[in-house]
Design a protein with these regions (language model features):
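Membrane-interface capping segments at transmembrane-helix boundaries
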Residues: 57-58, 260, 348-349, 463-475
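Transmembrane helix interruption/hinge and helix-loop junction motifs
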Residues: 150-152, 254-260, 385, 442-443
Length: 475
């Protein structure tokens, strides 16, 4: 049996990664994801591998297998990312998102915008089981409405993400919900019911904060909203017919059509509507002087795969309707691949297990057991950079420990979701954090302080354990 690295040695790649990422963000700022962060991850991956091979005789094939397995595990997510890039571009240029923004500004009062946004995203995410799909569709529209009403990007993104991850956490259609229940051998609906003990209070507190913030917002500047609405009408053909696209998308989701198929069909339908309702915009994007098949085809393809920058007389709207297409997802995909390399190297070397074993030593009472699980889940989210891997590892590490201490598996499954599912989006180099920052065009560290549900959930898990409320024990 190979000797595992000590916790102190295992921390070397983590410390180096933190230092490199700090230097990268300090040097490159918002451009850190354009290469600096990826190089930092690959550098620490190499350090981890070298330590394991030189001092612990861990063969290269072990690292290669762990890394390739990690990358294979996110292959579907990468495909979804590419389609989301195409969808976000074509939903904008076809007029779907502008139409949602136009009508949304007339329906949602600014004073209750943040709370309404959180509730809307929560309901859609519960029905879809996907925070990614929710944020990539209605989230983008709500982002536009919020900007038009004068809210800061961080507040809007925080409300969107809080609601979306509430739904992702408790929906029976969610992959994370199913994964957490299955990895801990907990019946799905037992898992969901037990999560309500920590999830509902977290959401209520979140809605109170957003309501207070909304009521404190200066909603008197209706002129700005009117200017954005006028600019939308001038640039796009706004019509209720465009609402067919999100309605069809909702029907596909309700019928449990696979995410990739749903997103692809939604992109295809929006493309057809772009040809029907926005031919002038497609010609403008193409740069072809003469209108015809070439200009329409060129504009449509450029919208799907590349960046578009349409000019309007309203600065806020010009920034809002800029799209990046599939190409805009490349830095995110690049970072995910590098993060999977790091997570695989840490797992194969035994360093990940060595570090997480530290938490087990302090597990005496219920609050320390739950606290150790929360800390391990957060640590795994930081180091593996993937919520699915973190859920699997957390469940596997603590399953036997919870059983020996007499706790029901639903306590572990709930704590795992409280610690992992909702916090993954708060980490800049985690696949969730990278994705949502890219989709919403808001840096992770900008929206982090406003994702109240995501911040409160792990704290609520520890609080409930500390007071001993409804702790599930084996009879």
């Amino acid at each position: 049996m190979k000797k595992a690295p000590s916790p102190l040695i295992s921390l070397i790649p983590i410390v180096v990664l933190v230092l490199l990422l700090f230097a990268t963000i300090r040097t490159f700022g918002s451009d850190a994801l354009s290469g600096g962060s990826q190089v930092s991850l690959l550098t620490t991956t190499a350090i981890c591998i070298l330590i394991g091979m030189a001092f612990y005789k861990i063969p290269w094939k072990d690292y290669e297998l762990a890394i390739t397995n990690n990358i294979a595990g996110v292959a579907t997510a990468i495909i979804i990312l590419l389609i989301i890039g195409a969808l976000s571009g074509i939903w904008m240029i076809s007029g779907v998102v502008p139409t949602l923004i136009y009508y949304g500004m007339q329906i949602i009062h600014p004073s209750f915008f943040l709370a309404s946004t959180c509730i809307i995203c929560a309901l859609i995410s519960v029905m879809t089981g996907s925070s990614w799909t929710t944020i990539a569709t209605i989230g983008i529209a709500l982002m536009g409405i919020g900007k038009a009403q004068g809210f800061e990007d961080g507040w809007i993104a925080g409300a969107i993400i809080s609601g979306a991850y509430f739904g992702d956490k408790i929906s029976p259609l969610s992959e994370t919900t199913i994964l957490a229940s299955s990895i801990t051998d907990t019946p799905l609906f037992r898992h969901i019911r037990y999560m309500m003990i920590t999830t509902i209070p977290s959401l209520i507190i979140t809605l109170i904060i957003f309501t207070v913030a909304g009521l404190s917002h200066d909603a008197s500047n209706t002129q700005h909203i009117a200017e954005v609405a006028t600019a939308l009408n001038e640039k796009f053909h706004i019509t209720p017919w465009l609402l067919i696209v999100p309605v069809v998308t909702g029907i596909l989701i309700a019928r449990k059509v696979p995410s990739i198929v749903t997103l692809f069909l939604s992109t295809l339908l929006a493309g057809v509507f772009a040809l029907i309702f926005q031919p002038e915009l497609l010609q403008e994007i193409s740069g072809v002087a003469v209108s015809g098949f070439d200009s329409l085809f060129n504009g449509l393809m450029m919208t799907v795969y590349g960046a578009t920058n349409l000019h309007t007389d309203n600065t806020v709207l010009t920034d809002l309707i800029a799209t990046r297409g599939m190409a805009g997802m490349m830095n995110t995909i690049w970072l995910i691949l590098c993060a999977m390399c790091f997570g695989g190297a840490m797992t194969a070397s035994g360093m990940l297990g060595s570090i997480t074993s530290i938490f087990v030593r302090f597990m005496k009472k219920t609050v320390s057991v739950v606290g150790a699980t929360v800390c391990s889940g957060l640590f795994l989210n930081l180091t593996t950079a993937d919520q699915y891997i973190s859920i699997i590892l957390t469940g596997n590490m603590f399953r036997d420990i919870y059983a020996k201490k007499g706790y029901e598996s639903c306590l572990l499954s709930r704590t795992t979701e409280d610690a992992v599912t909702v916090t993954s989006v708060l980490i800049p180099w985690n696949s969730c954090g990278m994705t949502q920052a890219t989709i919403l065009s808001v840096p992770t560290l900008v929206y982090l302080p406003y994702c109240f549900f995501n911040i409160i959930s792990p704290l609520m898990s520890i609080t409930v354990a500390a007071i001993g409320y409804k702790i599930a024990r084996r009879s």
